A protein has these predicted regions:
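Positively charged, polar, low-complexity stretches
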Residues: 1-97
Length: 97
């Protein structure tokens, strides 16, 4: 699902008050972290991820890897926080999008 700019703007507004659900530390993206990320994204649909590793390129790579792994879309990235979205197939809170 490709989101329009209006939809992304709405999701950014909804995501503003959220706190990061997953934190990627210096250990990077382990299998257990990816599994936890997948289950959290399935539950929340819209969530923040904090990436506390290295420089900007490493953070970009980690967020891009999470998006590719889970088929999520990056809505916004500010510093070391990424806002990711993946709509549920059934019973989505974001059915109007």
């Amino acid at each position: 699902m490709i989101l329009t700019e209006q939809q992304k703007k709405r999701l950014r507004g909804l995501g503003h008050k959220l706190k990061p659900v997953i934190t990627v530390g210096t250990g990077g993206l382990s299998d257990s972290l990816l599994a936890e990320f997948e289950s959290s994204l399935e539950h929340h649909e819209l969530m923040k991820v904090k990436v506390s590793t290295g420089d900007r390129d490493e953070r970009d790579t980690a967020i891009r890897t999470l998006c590719e792994y889970s088929n999520a879309q990056l809505i916004q990235r500010v510093g070391n926080i990424g806002l990711l979205f993946r709509k549920k197939k059934k019973n989505s809170k974001f059915a109007a999008l």
